[in-house]
From Swiss-Prot:
Glycans are attached at residues 117, 182, 248, 258. This is Tumor necrosis factor ligand superfamily member 6. Residues 126-135 have a biased composition (Polar residues). The record marks 79-80, 127-128 as: Cleavage. PANTHER family: TUMOR NECROSIS FACTOR FAMILY MEMBER (PTHR11471), TUMOR NECROSIS FACTOR LIGAND SUPERFAMILY MEMBER 6 (PTHR11471:SF33). The gene is Faslg. Gene3D superfamilies: 2.60.120.40. Residues 101-279 are extracellular. SMART domains: TNF (SM00207). Residues 30-70, 126-150 are annotated as: Disordered. It comes from Mus musculus. CDD domains: TNF. The keyword Disulfide bond applies.
Length: 279
């Protein structure tokens, strides 16, 4: 039998003694060259490698671990659908009730408005029946007067302008330079006179408001101002005198303004005036 020649030493041959060979005598054995005697320069061959263990037969595939059975879902998880449905149903019912309440309130409000309007109409009609309307009475005009300076005034007491410019009169009368009271009450009376001159001679300046009534034997002075040394001698000068106070006047009282120097008065309507108004 043939053996591979590259197999490592030593090799073992089985020799059959009964076999004959044309190239060797029977019983002869050809030892391995390494088994013969070594010379002094020859080295011993390395030991043979350890025998290789035979490969195990192909193993069977490992069995798969048994599948763990899935846990059954909790029975409570199946209740979420009915719960959600119930919540939606409750919300819809609440919305419906709210809309019904709103509609009902609007209806009641409309009925209340209609009832109120009818009540007002009935009340107004009853008042008209109980108190029939009478022609509206004209309210008495408020007692007020404002008279301005009259440059044509040449006598005492002073005469005034009661028609033109800023002059006005209502609720009282103007008669011969005086204001006649028609209604008893409290009045604020005022008067302003503007004096001026080209040269100063220091003559006394008198300005007064007085009242005249048939009940009194003499005139009653209400307000008065008297000025001295109001200018420098020989120079142009000007002086303004103002009087004003509240008085309790009665019907038929006459009010006048008197001054001492008629020729020294500036009769411009913004500088000299006389008036009153009822409080």
């Amino acid at each position: 039998m043939q053996q591979p020649m590259n197999y490592p030493c030593p090799q073992i041959f089985w020799v059959d003694s009964s076999a004959t060979s044309s190239w060797a005598p029977p019983g002869s054995v050809f030892p391995c060259p390494s088994c013969g005697p070594r010379g002094p320069d020859q080295r011993r061959p390395p030991p043979p490698p350890p025998p290789v263990s035979p490969l195990p037969p192909p193993s069977q595939p490992l069995p798969l671990p048994p599948l763990t059975p899935l846990k059954k879902k909790d029975h409570n998880t199946n209740l979420w659908l009915p719960v959600v449905f119930f919540m939606v149903l409750v919300a819809l019912v609440g919305m419906g009730l709210g809309m019904y309440q709103l509609f009902h309130l609007q209806k009641e409000l409309a009925e209340l408005r209609e009832f109120t309007n009818q009540s007002l109409k009935v009340s107004s009609f009853e008042k008209q029946i109980a108190n029939p309307s009478t022609p509206s009475e004209k309210k008495e005009p408020r007692s007020v007067a404002h008279l301005t300076g009259n440059p044509h005034s040449r006598s005492i007491p002073l005469e005034w302008e009661d028609t033109y410019g800023t002059a006005l009169i209502s609720g009282v009368k103007y008669k011969k330079g005086g204001l006649v009271i028609n209604e008893t009450g409290l009045y604020f009376v005022y008067s302003k006179v503007y004096f001026r001159g080209q040269s100063c001679n220091n003559q006394p300046l008198n300005h007064k408001v007085y009242m005249r009534n048939s009940k009194y034997p003499e005139d009653l002075v209400l307000m008065e101002e008297k000025r001295l040394n109001y200018c420098t001698t020989g120079q142009i000068w000007a002086h303004s005198s103002y009087l004003g106070a509240v008085f309790n006047l009665t019907s038929a009282d006459h009010l006048y303004v008197n001054i001492s120097q008629l020729s020294l008065i500036n009769f411009e309507e913004s500088k000299t005036f006389f008036g009153l108004y009822k409080l």
